[in-house]
Amino acid sequence: MSSTPFTIAPSIPTELDGFRVEIDVARERADVVLDRPPFNIISMPQRDQLRVTFEALDADDRIRVIVLRANGEHFSSGGEIKGFLDASPEHVARLAWNIAAPARCGKPVIAANRGYCFGVGFEISLACDFRLASETCLYALPEQRLGQIPGSGGSARLQKMVGITRTKDIVMRSRRISGKQAYDWGVATACVADDKLEGEIDALVEELRGFSSLAQRTAKKLLNDTEDASLSTAIELEGHCYSRLRTSDDFREGVDAFQQKRKPNFRGS
């Protein structure tokens, strides 16, 4: 007798190492909060748990937007140094995959950055869709000071954003850049006063909730998938995605709402 294959949805680990998860069903929002004060150092086991958590939140239909933030005045000063030496080769091989979890989410992910945002803290922020930085924020990939290089996708993602010259300046000199500099270079989505950061995050969450979740997922996947594509390939894929969305309920609702001069009621289908 054959059985029908099925997939078990991932679940958030019951005992979290160095972070917590807050879910606000009414606002369709989940917050992943780094919580190992004062510097919110990220351990090796924590990286695995963060990946599983993002996968679980992505599969949770109650959630529309995910926010990655931290407790205290620093987002994260980076990884646990001892963990680098103790980690198995198999664990090290998963570093970039774990930290890329926000990018693989179909839902929009926002990073709220303040204070130190170094090493893996910077790398996981780079994997998010939006980086809102406070004026206190300092970004850095300081691995050269340890005789190493970034190992979780930081230099690769940064080079795509700012080019090889600025990436060498940041990586090879272990240079710190401010939130304002990151905004000017296109690394940060916005740079705001520190006491305005939470308000800006809240406003962005509400803005994103107002769009079709289907259109949001489609746009994110298209942009991620075409990052390394030629212009002609990217245009072709964009056309395919556009054509598919033309048959969606949300597109019809959006057109009707526009013509009727009312707010659309998107349902994600």
Which sequence ranges carry the predicted segments?
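Hydrophobic alpha-helical core bundles mediating ligand binding, dimerization, or RNAP-core interactions
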Residues: 92-99, 205, 223, 235-238, ...
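Amphipathic alpha-helical segments at domain termini/boundaries
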Residues: 2-34, 175-209, 217-226, 254, ...
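Crotonase-fold acyl-CoA enzyme core
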Residues: 103-214, 248, 253, 262
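Glycine- (often His-adjacent) and acidic-residue-rich active-site loop
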Residues: 47-49, 62, 69-104, 117, ...
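Conserved CoA-thioester-binding segment of acyl-CoA-metabolizing enzymes
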Residues: 1-71
